[in-house]
Amino acid sequence: MKKFKYVIGVDEAGRGPLAGPVVAVGVMIHLKSQISNLKTTTQNSKLNKMFKELKIKDSKQLSLKRREEIFKLLKKHPRILWAKGMVSAKVIDKINIWEATKLAMKRSIKNLEKKIGKKFPKKKTLLIIDGNLKIDSGFIEQPIIKADQKISECILASIFAKVIRDRLMERYDKIYPKYNFKKHKGYPTKEHKRLITKYGACKIHRRSFKGVGGKRLSG
């Protein structure tokens, strides 16, 4: 495999819900404490050992409590650099969920560049994307099915994105308490669909999604 100066893993949370944003996180793991000497690998033995000890795996296989624990433990780890990108329900309705997912991922990379204070060189940066989606980022892209179970950067991106989105939906629950967003996080559960039918859609519902479109706007 070609050697890259930077390896970034990207994953998203919130592609399937009927409400709320789609959230993407880009993660880069570096072996040096100084960015100027940055060298990245998905085969970092120390981090792999830490992943094993912490029993870190794909966010979908972890409980909410465990995801929160891992996020709190690793969000400020000196070797883990990350940034988020979000796209609102309103924009999702305008451009569709696939384009919104790509946009969220691109925003996460741009925000990661801002965070470290430098641009990633296009030909020396490998972007590993969970799934089979290409996002036209300009970087060398490698979509990998189930990367969120195999690639350290994508595993972390998956966990971080899920935690960030869950927290956001819990905040929305306080603004729109009758929809119980805290429980289902906007996903199309029977309860959520029933509440949409009863109260209509609120401002963070995705009007272009089946089960929401055509429902009166509440509030």
Predicted regions and their residues:
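RNase H-like, Mg2+-dependent phosphodiesterase core
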Residues: 1-34, 45-219
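Conserved positions within tandem-repeat grammars
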Residues: 36-38
